[in-house]
Amino acid sequence: MKLYLVTFLFFVIYKNKTFVDCVTKKQDVYLDDEFKSFTFFFASSPSANFLSRIVHSNEAKFTQIKNKTDIWNKTIDKAYSINQVSNNIMRVYISLLSLFLFPYFSYIGIFGHSRNKANLTLSSLLAYFALLVSFFLFNGILNIGFVTSLPLVVAVLIFILGVSDCEINFLYKYTRYIFCFIISKLIYDVVTYISKDGANIFDYGFSGHIYMNLLRGKYYIVLKLIHLIILSLISLIIIKICPKIFSNNHLKSPISITFDKYIISFLCSLPIATAISQVFYLLSKTINPIDPSIFFMIPSSINFSSTGTIFSLSIWILMSYLMTFLRNKVEADFNNILNKIPNNLPDFI
């Protein structure tokens, strides 16, 4: 009898050990790169502070927020699946991209006012906008190989098309629309940040409510498309509110021509500020909120209470002013040189 009992206990202990080992191995399988990427990003984000407050809060506080409409768990694992915080390839890629774009946009931002460089400048801005939108559409949907290659391919194609086939008036028209679209993104982030109740720093805003209430949050790509539509509508509203600046009927009006200089300086300063913010990110290990790979990402990476966001936006504003000042300085010097050329120079030659 004792022999049977010992045999039975040995069998139970062995099966339990085997079961535990199997569970451990299965858990290791599920800890893939995508889950690890999200885990590391979330642990380094301000949302971790919110989670900590929930864990250490009393039951009454937890009861108040646990019944809220929760759209995060359906999409947050995809939102930042490829990011600099947890992916070394992405960190090196964005750093090299920023290093390349910094001198290029500095040059066209200062010297791109001349007629022979206007097409190059506007095509470059259109290509960079295509890069931002492509990153937004592909990140969280495709793997890192496609996320790092396809946006560059799209941007290069748009640049070639703009330089070779597009008229200058067409480029100015869409440059103004790009400006309105980026302003719409900032307005959306500000309104979302102000209207939130503090339950989640990375808020989806109005696009998220439409996504969950009407479409029940089926596919993350649908949320991306809805967000682009919302930003496009806000952009059209801005154009309608300021027709003298953005309307197609006023492409050559004095106020539009003057404002175009500020628009170009503002847009050229974005990749410049991104490069400076990238250095700040690498040194301080914070999130670069204007990183092109997550610039349009929803939920937004811009958190107006974080040091990284305040630094990046401040640098962006400062670079916009500096680009405008240097651009006007170069243009004034160029006009002075032209005025000193004798009017009868062609006859003399």
Swiss-Prot record:
Keywords: Cell membrane, Membrane, Signal, Transmembrane, Transmembrane helix. Residues 113-117, 162-176, 240-262, 327-349 are cytoplasmic. Residues 19-91, 139-140, 198-218, 284-305 are extracellular. The chain crosses the membrane at residues 92-112, 118-138, 141-161, 177-197, 219-239, 263-283, 306-326. Residues 1-18 form the signal peptide. Antibodies against G37/pbg37 partially reduce parasite transmission during the mosquito vector stage by preventing male gametocyte exflagellation and fertilization. Involved in the development of male gametocytes. This is Sexual stage-specific protein G37. It comes from Plasmodium berghei (strain Anka). The gene is G37.
